[in-house]
Amino acid sequence: MLTSLAHTAVCVPDVEEAVRWYEAVLGLTVIWPPVLLENDDIERDMGELIPAPVAVKGAILGVGDAGVSGDRVLEVIQYPRAPGRAKRADGALTDHGYSHVGLVCDDLAATRADLEAKGVRFLTEGIADIVGLRTTWFEDPWRNVFILMEKRHPEKPYYSQF
C-alpha cells in the first residue's frame, strides 16, 4: 500500500550546473549534494532501464522543512553514460502534453517578477486565476516545465482551493 509521495525527479545534462541554478534562481536548499552512483546497488535498481555501464549522478533539493520530513523533494538526475537526445523543438515534452513540477509561493506576482529579473523564461504571458489558484508556467534552462501557484487558502492543499 502506498503511504506518501516521496519525490519528483527532473533529468538534466549537468547536475552541478542544475543544482547551482535551482539554488540561485529558485532558492531551493541542497539536502543531498551531487553524488555519482555506479555500484552494484544502482545496477540492481536501474540496470534494466539504462544502458550499461549503469551510472546515475543525482542531488536532492527541497523547500523549508523538506529535509526534516525527508519527502516531497526535487531529485535532480543526470545519466552520465547514457546517450542523450535533444528535447522536441516544438516545446512539447511528451506527445500527451506537459509533464511538470508544481511549486507553491506566497506572492505569485512578486515571485514571477523576481524570477524574470533572474532571466527565467516564462511559458505563459501573465497570471491565471483558476479554481482558487493563481498560476503561471516557466521552464528551467534544460526545458523542464514548472507551474508556480499561489493558493487562495494557504492552509488547504492546492487541489482543494475552490
What residues fall within each predicted segment?
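Short, solvent-exposed beta-strand edge segments and adjacent coil->beta transition regions
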Residues: 3-7, 96-100
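A cross-kingdom feature marking solvent-exposed beta-strand/loop segments within repeated
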Residues: 39-45, 84, 124, 128
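Vicinal oxygen chelate
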Residues: 10, 33, 60, 74, ...
